[in-house]
Amino acid sequence: MKHHSLIFLTGFSGSGKSTIGPLLANSLGYGFIDLDQEIESKAGKSITKIFAEEGEQTFRNLELETLRQLTGKKELVVSLGGGVLENNDCYRLIRENGTLVYLKSSPRSLARRLCNKTDRPLLKGEHGTRLSREEIELKISTILEKREPRYATADLSVQTDIKRIGSTVEELTRTIIRFVRQAEQARLKQQSDNNREKQ
């Protein structure tokens, strides 16, 4: 389908962005880009290395620059990094240029999905020690509470806790198509109303 162009997927690490994103893009006939992978490709190193060698500010600058380039594209699903909405400039770009979709999961589900991963800084304590599932869940709850005000502004929100990935993608595809059609109808109506006022 050819319609309204740029879809940003947000949500906590483990919410299903990198799994659902390509499937959703395929279902819509769009391209797919993972923002973090795009940044790593540009920098020629992993995000962990960027943070360690050049600091967070360098990473945030790369994040914003990469996002700016993507906002000029159409028919694209973009999976966002977990904290990208906390960057005010990135947040503004996203809200002005596309549809924001929040993939929502409970701290318990997220902790269960993430506890076997070994490469996530989130899973480590102050001195690099591995956290228990309960500690991870508590840490996730704290971060989610901080991010929730931005997540709450998403155009669409989909629960990814217990559903099969396939049914989530189907539901999301239908919802996005409906949302885009309604947005286009509202835009055309506004345009028509404006034209009438000018006459």
From Swiss-Prot:
ATP binds at G14, S15, G16, K17, S18, T19, R120. GO terms for biological process: amino acid biosynthetic process; aromatic amino acid family biosynthetic process; chorismate biosynthetic process. Gene3D superfamilies: P-loop containing nucleotide triphosphate hydrolases (3.40.50.300). PROSITE patterns: SHIKIMATE_KINASE (PS01128). Catalyzes the specific phosphorylation of the 3-hydroxyl group of shikimic acid using ATP as a cosubstrate. HAMAP family: Shikimate_kinase (MF_00109). This is Shikimate kinase.
